Amino acid sequence: MAHYRIIDTASWPRRDHFTFYRQFANPSFNLCVPIAAQRLYECAKDRRVSFFQLALYALLRAANGVPQLRQRVWNDEVIEYDSLAVMTPVMTVGEGFRQVWCDNAPEFTAFSA
């Protein structure tokens, strides 16, 4: 069950931005940046764990560390989730794809289980 809090938009510092962007048909964003992942790759190799899972875990931890990325509009209210999960496509043996839901976890071993 998702836990969240409702943000009081009357006193919210981001209210003006929210008012402007909520008028858009699809108020979302995408982010593409180069990431130096060699150390993470070496860490995964040393630990004999999946680089993909370790990178996904690191990205989810980073996203959860930014309150604004945990915020959503729901029933005309702004809410902030305590924690985010992630859904990602994973290739199957037959080269098809399956969507996999991954809950946030405090430790990588629990995340990758």
List PLM regions with ranges.
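Gly/Ser/Thr-rich phosphate-binding loops and adjoining beta-strand/alpha-helix segments
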Residues: A2-A10, Y21-L54, G65, R70-A85
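Structural preference for long, well-ordered alpha-helical segments in enzyme cores
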Residues: L56-A62
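Helical lid/core segments from catalytic subdomains that handle acyl or acyl-like groups
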Residues: T92-A113
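Basic, often amphipathic N-terminal segments
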Residues: W12-H17
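Short polybasic amphipathic segments
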Residues: M87-V90
